[in-house]
């Protein structure tokens, strides 16, 4: 072969190979601008210094959605179990369970309702704690699964209260073509959503059933493709039907078949008898009791219903109501008058009054829901708006919809509720309203096209420090130096949770160093310490915000901490060395990235304060684009979607109607949304607020971010006070709030076991325990730490702090925890 032919080709081939390698590398990561970058190819497994393997595990499935538009699907929301639907991870189906009750998803908590798509239809129940129901858990006699006492281990030798609600499956919504008896539904798909409402469909070979549900909505609106409305309800042999028009009648076993209901609307009183409720004050005494739940069904205008197919199922009596025509209907759970509970038999007069009001709103279909915050000085107002449209062929009331308000929405707020005569009254008259029981406290009935809540924005500072004298300033300079010298590099290199916490500790030293510089006897030494903190924080966080190692030519492996963008879910995923399923289930992103944002803010603050300092590396300008992506991951304020990646869902963690965040990404399991640490959620929203207010480098998005961050910060603080700490200044309401409502029932809960707070709230349970241990210090600490300049809400009321009985923990346990010991308490 002629060598002259090869001579020019060889350099060309080498150049092509280099270009090809460069293109392949560039395709593995993307920079949003500046020095930061993120991976778009999953990082390979890597090794830690101790030779342990670190891997990134991506979500097993993508969104279960069939919806128009460009939006990314929310996670960490009340309806997420419908979107995060993994066929390999569905509820257990015990041997002998009827096919009708096989779940097509996990339970979904809209509150006051809970529902679950099943093969036999949409199973529905009131999400209600029954604190009298007897039961066992772990061989421990309880006052019921409604109030469980869990022995939490030898280390604490204590009892951990555990409050939860039940899914009794009182109604099954379906159609004449696919209902309870056919057990034919095979799939469920999300078809649309707004800020706190969702649309989904259930399909069988013969039917498509479309459902509209909302957080705080007592209604479920159903539209059918082909069949007529059909509802199966349980009556436990002693139920009663109350039509809107006509006489009521019993539905005892075998008596209901063929019974006509000559009204489009009727209610069912579901009386469930129980026996031998355990009385903590006297274990020898037992007491029979019943619970009463009232459900309402609304057929098309001019329709009637016929009861058919009465049958027994697992001790229950089931009756099926078939509608005379139409392809739409609605179901609802009715409230009780204030002062009555699920243990009190409801009056027919109240039921008919409620039926009339609910019937006039049942077919005002909610087509959109929106929350809009406005910041004014030190307060923020959030407006909640419903958009409704009449279902075809119906003429609902024109004043909007009915909704159930949580305590944070009506307590000490200028909103209206419906009183006992169905007129509007101020929420300060809550004892004259209608309510549903809930774990968080009574939910009040209200109507309209929306409402507004106003909250004071708590103090939010970069750090908390007094004005030190020279001696104190000098000591603090030495402590800053000591913190730098003793920092464990292995701990600093941990994953996206503990590593982020350690970087955050560095960042918290920056404002402290700035504050003490002027008082120190040697300002140069203080300045040197501050610069050392700045450099280490900037270098460490900068490394975390790059997808490549320092050479910039290859993609990091999972042990080197690259952030990977998952276009299916629209999220930045960290490697899961210590991430508590932040990768595979998208848990806790607001915790992890909140620490990153706070660190970035303090680095930027130092640079803004020292623009001409020769040590100013321009970190903020270089990494602000990546910081903004992390902010959008946890708190994107755009609903419409850009249609181009990277894009993110609207408010990933913060649930506007609930008033706080949910930390669980998938909400899998039958507990629904879950959040343990309110303090870390609050820290995240405070970090966003400080970043927006600092506005360095200046960016137009920060003005919008500021009002949303202030709203989430203020609302999360309010929810933490009410629901996790059970605290309100309204002494009259206090016995009804959160876990305190159980303390008010001496025949249901032994008062010594009622805690001063709860450490974890799920949508169907709240517990005074943590996922990582149960000494009281840990159970309290998860609601306190990190203590920062945004933690001042914890000390707003000294009386409340004293009541939490934390003084002993601070004096005896805190030093031991700081020394790495496990406190005996």
Regions found by a protein language model. Give the residues of each.
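N-terminal secretory signal peptides that target proteins for export/translocation
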Residues: 1-8
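Bacterial N-terminal signal peptides
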Residues: 11-21
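Sec/Tat signal peptide C-region and signal peptidase I cleavage site
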Residues: 22-26
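Ser/Thr/Asn(+Pro)-rich, low-complexity disordered segments
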Residues: 27-588, 637-660, 695, 708-825
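Aromatic-rich carbohydrate-recognition surfaces in CAZymes
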Residues: 493-516, 520, 583-619, 623-627, ...
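Flexible, surface-exposed loop/gating regions in the mature catalytic domains
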Residues: 568-572, 576-580, 609-620, 624, ...
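Short secondary-structure subsegments characteristic of cysteine-rich extracellular domains
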Residues: 619-631, 703-720
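Active-site neighborhood of glycoside hydrolase catalytic domains
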Residues: 678-715
């Amino acid at each position: 072969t002629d060598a002259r032919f090869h001579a020019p080709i060889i350099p060309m081939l080498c150049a092509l190979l280099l270009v090809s390698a460069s293109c392949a590398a560039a395709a593995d990561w993307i920079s949003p601008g500046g020095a930061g970058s993120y991976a778009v190819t999953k990082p390979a497994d890597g090794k830690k210094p101790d030779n342990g393997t670190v891997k990134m595990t991506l979500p097993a499935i993508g969104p279960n959605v069939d919806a128009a538009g460009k939006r990314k699907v929310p996670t960490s929301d009340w309806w997420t179990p419908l979107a995060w639907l993994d066929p390999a991870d569905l509820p257990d189906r015990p041997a002998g369970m009827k096919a009708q009750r096989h779940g097509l998803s996990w339970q979904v908590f809209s509150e006051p309702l809970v529902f679950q798509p099943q093969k036999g239809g949409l199973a529905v129940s009131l999400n209600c704690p029954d604190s009298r129901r007897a039961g066992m858990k772990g061989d421990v006699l309880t006052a019921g699964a409604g109030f469980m006492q869990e022995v939490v281990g030898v280390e604490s030798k204590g009892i951990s209260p555990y409050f939860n609600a039940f899914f009794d499956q009182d109604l099954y919504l379906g159609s004449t073509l696919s209902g309870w008896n056919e057990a034919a539904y095979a799939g469920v798909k999300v078809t649309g959503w707004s800020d706190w409402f969702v649309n989904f469909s259930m399909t069988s070979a013969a039917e498509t059933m479309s459902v509209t549900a909302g957080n705080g909505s007592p209604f479920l609106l159903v539209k059918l493709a082909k069949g007529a409305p059909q509802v199966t309800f349980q009556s436990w042999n002693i139920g009663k039907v109350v039509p809107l028009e006509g006489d009521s009648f019993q539905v005892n076993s075998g008596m209901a078949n063929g019974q006509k209901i000559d009204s489009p609307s009727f209610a069912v009183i579901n009386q469930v008898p129980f026996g031998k409720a355990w009385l903590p004050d006297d274990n020898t005494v037992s007491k029979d009791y019943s619970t009463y739940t009232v459900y309402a069904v609304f057929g098309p205008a001019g329709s009637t219903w016929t009861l058919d197919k009465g049958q027994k199922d697992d001790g229950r009596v089931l009756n099926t109501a078939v509608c005379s025509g139409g392809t739409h209907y609605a179901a609802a759970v009715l409230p009780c008058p204030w002062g009555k509970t699920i243990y009190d038999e409801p009056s027919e007069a109240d039921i008919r009054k409620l039926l009339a009001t609910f019937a006039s709103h049942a077919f005002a279909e909610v087509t959109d829901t929106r929350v809009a915050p406005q910041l004014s000085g030190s307060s923020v107002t959030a407006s909640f708006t419903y958009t409704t449209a009449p279902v075809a062929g119906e003429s609902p009331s024109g004043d909007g919809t009915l909704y159930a308000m949580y305590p944070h929405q009506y307590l000490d707020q200028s909103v209206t509720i419906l009183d006992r005569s169905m007129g509007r009254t101020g929420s300060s008259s809550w004892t004259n309203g209608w309510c549903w029981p809930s774990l968080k406290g009574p939910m009040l009935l209200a109507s309209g096209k929306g409402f507004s809540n106003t909250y004071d924005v708590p103090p939010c500072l970069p750090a908390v420090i007094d004005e030190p004298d020279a001696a104190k300033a000098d000591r603090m300079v030495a402590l800053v130096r000591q913190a730098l010298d003793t920092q464990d590099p292995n701990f600093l290199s941990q994953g996206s949770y503990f590593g982020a916490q350690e970087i955050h500790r560095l960042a918290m030293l920056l404002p402290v160093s700035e504050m003490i510089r002027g008082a120190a006897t040697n300002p140069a030494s203080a300045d040197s310490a501050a610069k050392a903190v700045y450099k280490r924080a900037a270098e460490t966080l900068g490394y975390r915000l790059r997808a490549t190692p320092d050479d910039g030519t290859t993609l990091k492996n999972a042990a080197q901490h690259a952030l990977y963008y998952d276009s299916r879910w629209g999220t930045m995923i960290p490697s899961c060395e210590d991430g508590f399923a932040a990768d595979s289930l998208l848990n806790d992103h607001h915790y992890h990235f909140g620490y990153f944002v706070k660190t970035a803010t303090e680095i930027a603050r130092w640079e803004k304060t020292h623009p001409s300092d020769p040590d100013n590396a321009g970190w903020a300008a270089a990494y602000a684009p990546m910081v903004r992506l992390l902010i959008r991951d946890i708190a994107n304020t755009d609903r419409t979607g850009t249609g181009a990646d990277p894009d993110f869902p609207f408010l990933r963690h913060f649930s506007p109607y609930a008033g706080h965040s949910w930390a669980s990404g998938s909400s899998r399991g039958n507990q629904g949304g879950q959040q343990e640490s309110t303090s870390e959620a609050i820290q995240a929203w405070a970090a966003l607020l400080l970043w927006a207010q600092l506005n360095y480098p200046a960016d137009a998005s920060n003005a919008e971010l500021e009002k949303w961050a202030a709203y989430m910060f203020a609302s999360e603080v309010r929810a933490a006070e009410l629901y996790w700490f059970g605290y309100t200044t309204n002494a009259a309401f206090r016995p009804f709030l959160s876990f305190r409502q159980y303390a008010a029932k001496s025949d249901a809960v032994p008062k010594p076991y009622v805690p001063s707070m709860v450490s974890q709230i799920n949508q169907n349970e709240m517990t005074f325990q943590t996922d990582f241990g149960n000494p009281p210090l840990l159970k309290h600490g998860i609601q306190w730490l990190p203590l920062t300049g945004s933690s001042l809400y914890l000390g707003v009321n000294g009386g409340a702090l004293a009541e939490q009985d934390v003084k002993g923990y601070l004096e005896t346990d805190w030093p031991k925890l700081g020394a790495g010991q496990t406190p005996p308490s």
